[in-house]
């Protein structure tokens, strides 16, 4: 990370896409995409996905590391080009507990991530706990972030400290996505970014963490990009001009969250304006979902009814029987909720792919289609971009390859934004 930030600060229009997903096909897509490019790949886990108690994936930080390393080994991707990050590390998961208890768990969370070899650590203590006022005083946020940083510094070995980097601040919706519709988004004011930096610097110095301040590479801000279930707020560079100018005077860059579904030109403009770390998550699993749905349509055309996976029906059955991950986010009317379940840009389906019934039906779908030849006309009908790539001879038409390539469509837009010489 340090090398990428140094090159950006030296004037190169270079950035990095942060892949925020625990889905094995998404991780495989990212690693295959940059297998021969020489670029580093940044893969991040959030505190609610992966923590010392297992998170909703059932993985502790060391488990997630081994999971990613296992995929890298299968793909042949060298570990030294992999950067592992932890996002929203702080009391996020324990906001309903008193601050003292939540911070105790947060310290252990940080230690577990650093001990497992994660080198990019987002120190996020911005959320109010059960006995806190709302919003939290910025100095309290900074003091808590400093305590988390202290935990990281005492855990890291000297070798780890060579690569260890921190991200501070938060200016993002609830981790996991917006719960309600958005119409506009507030761009961070440069004075608020400056205050975030000043309060964190002061709090770090009180704890003797002057050396750690040199490892702070980025501040999370809101440059004016967001999405909800049905709409996207696109980047307007002129609205973020003052914010973009302020960061030039520091040794840092910005990190932008929720950059999913922006145009490739927007990614290039964001990187030009010093939002050099671009996080993406739901757009990747949305592309995965599109690929699964497209393959299900092909299966309906090619496989006899009694042999089909019924993957779309299984998804509906599971999500309606177990609505915990989508109910409070989607519209209450039945017909509207079904559209959201299937097609929402916030992609709450992503929480259901590990479900045993859904996983088995996806496996059957892929097995069924592996046993037949996929007609080019059918691929053109349901995956037209992949059809073009088949015609160019850069893709072979297996179900697995089609899924991977569909996810990589998203990564192509980020590569255009993060790499100045990509046309």
Swiss-Prot record:
Keyword Cytoplasm included in the entry's annotation: no
Keywords for this protein: Galactitol metabolism
Domain of life from the UniProt record: Bacteria
GO cellular component entries: plasma membrane
Disulfide bond annotation, renumbered to this chain: none
Pfam families: GatZ_KbaZ-like (PF08013)
Xref: InterPro entries: Aldolase_TIM, GatZ/KbaZ-like, GatZ_KbaZ_carbometab, TagBP_ald_GatZ
Membrane-spanning residues: none
One BP term from GO: phosphoenolpyruvate-dependent sugar phosphotransferase system
Keyword Iron-sulfur: no
Pathway: Carbohydrate metabolism; D-tagatose 6-phosphate degradation; D-glyceraldehyde 3-phosphate and glycerone phosphate from D-tagatose 6-phosphate: step 2/2
Coiled-coil regions listed in the entry: none
Job description of the protein: Component of the tagatose-1,6-bisphosphate aldolase GatYZ that is required for full activity and stability of the Y subunit. Could have a chaperone-like function for the proper and stable folding of GatY. When expressed alone, GatZ does not show any aldolase activity. Is involved in the catabolism of galactitol.
PANTHER family, alphabetized: D-TAGATOSE-1,6-BISPHOSPHATE ALDOLASE SUBUNIT GATZ, N-ACETYLGALACTOSAMINE PERMEASE II COMPONENT-RELATED
Family: Belongs to the GatZ/KbaZ family. GatZ subfamily.
Protein name: D-tagatose-1,6-bisphosphate aldolase subunit GatZ
Species, as recorded: Salmonella newport (strain SL254)
Originating gene: gatZ
């Amino acid at each position: 990370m340090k090398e990428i930030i140094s090159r950006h600060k030296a004037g190169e229009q270079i950035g990095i896409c942060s892949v925020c997903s625990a889905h094995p096909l998404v991780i495989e897509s990212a690693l295959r995409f940059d297998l021969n490019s020489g670029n580093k790949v940044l893969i991040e886990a959030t505190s609610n996905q992966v923590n010392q108690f297992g998170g909703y994936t059932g993985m502790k930080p060391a488990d997630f590391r081994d999971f990613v390393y296992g995929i890298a080994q299968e793909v042949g991707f060298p570990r030294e080009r992999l950067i592992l990050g932890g996002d929203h590390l702080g009391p996020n998961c324990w906001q309903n507990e008193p601050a003292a208890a939540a911070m105790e768990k947060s310290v252990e969370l940080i230690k577990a991530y650093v001990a497992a070899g994660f080198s990019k650590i987002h120190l996020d203590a911005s959320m109010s706990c059960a006995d806190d006022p709302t919003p939290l005083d910025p100095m309290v946020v900074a003091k808590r972030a400093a305590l988390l940083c202290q935990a990281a510094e005492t855990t890291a070995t000297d070798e780890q400290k060579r690569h260890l980097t921190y991200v501070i601040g938060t200016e993002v919706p609830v981790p996991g996505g917006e719960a309600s519709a958005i119409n506009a988004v507030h761009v961070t004011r440069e004075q608020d970014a400056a205050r975030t930096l000043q309060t964190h610097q002061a709090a770090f110095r009180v704890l003797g963490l002057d050396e750690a301040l040199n490892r702070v590479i980025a501040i999370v801000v809101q440059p004016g990009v967001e999405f909800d279930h049905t709409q996207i707020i696109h980047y307007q560079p002129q609205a973020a001009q003052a914010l973009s100018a302020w960061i030039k005077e520091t040794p840092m860059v910005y990190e932008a969250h929720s950059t999913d579904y922006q145009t490739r030109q927007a990614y290039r403009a964001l990187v030009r304006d010093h939002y050099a770390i671009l996080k993406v998550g739901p757009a990747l699993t949305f592309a995965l979902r599109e690929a699964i749905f497209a393959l299900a349509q092909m299966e309906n055309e090619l496989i006899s009814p009694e042999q089909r996976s019924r993957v779309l029906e299984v998804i509906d059955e599971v999500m309606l029987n177990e609505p915990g991950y989508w109910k409070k986010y989607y519209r209450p009317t039945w017909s509207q909720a079904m559209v959201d379940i299937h097609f929402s840009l916030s992609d709450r389906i992503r929480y259901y792919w590990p479900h045993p019934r859904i996983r088995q039906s996806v496996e059957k779908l892929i097995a069924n289609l592996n046993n037949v030849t996929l007609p080019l006309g059918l691929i053109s009908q349901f995956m037209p971009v992949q059809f073009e790539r088949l015609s160019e001879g850069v893709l072979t038409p297996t179900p697995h390859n089609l899924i991977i390539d569909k996810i990589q469509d998203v990564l192509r837009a980020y590569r255009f934004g993060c790499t100045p010489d990509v046309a």
